[in-house]
Amino acid sequence: MEMKNMVVGLFLIAAFALPALATSFEKDFITHETVQAILKKVGPSSNGMLDEQAISALTGKTIISNPVLEEALLTHSNSINALGGTLPCGESCVWIPCISAVVGCSCKSKVCYKNSLA
């Protein structure tokens, strides 16, 4: 009986803890500088505005500091999927599209990159 209670308890813990853990690893991120650039582009003195979906998507991304992004890029720059020297916009697009598209960025390989023609 005691073993049965332990197994049931383990399954209950796994049922509630594991989904939350999995979603924390798959969240999109955005840097503070990218948020500032977007807000400057669509500010009150400009003609652009973010629609309701873009605002909802922006609040769904995790804001990280620029040094964290730079460290991650430096760590993975020599990997098989190297970035190739292009400039990332400070935003990922794993689940949510690039909100920084208003400042000339587009999604490629789950990372938003600056369009050189913009």
Curated annotation (Swiss-Prot):
Keywords associated with the record: Disulfide bond, Knottin, Plant defense, Signal
Signal peptide: 1-22
Gene name of this polypeptide: Voc2
Family label: Belongs to the cyclotide family. Bracelet subfamily.
Tissues and organs where the protein is expressed, per its UniProt entry: Expressed in leaves, petals and petioles but not in roots and runners (at protein level).
Chain positions of cross-link Cyclopeptide (Gly-Asn): 85-115
GO biological process: defense response
Protein name in UniProt: Cycloviolacin-O11
Transmembrane segments: none
Modified how: Cycloviolacin-O11 is a cyclic peptide.
Propiece residues: 23-84, 116-118
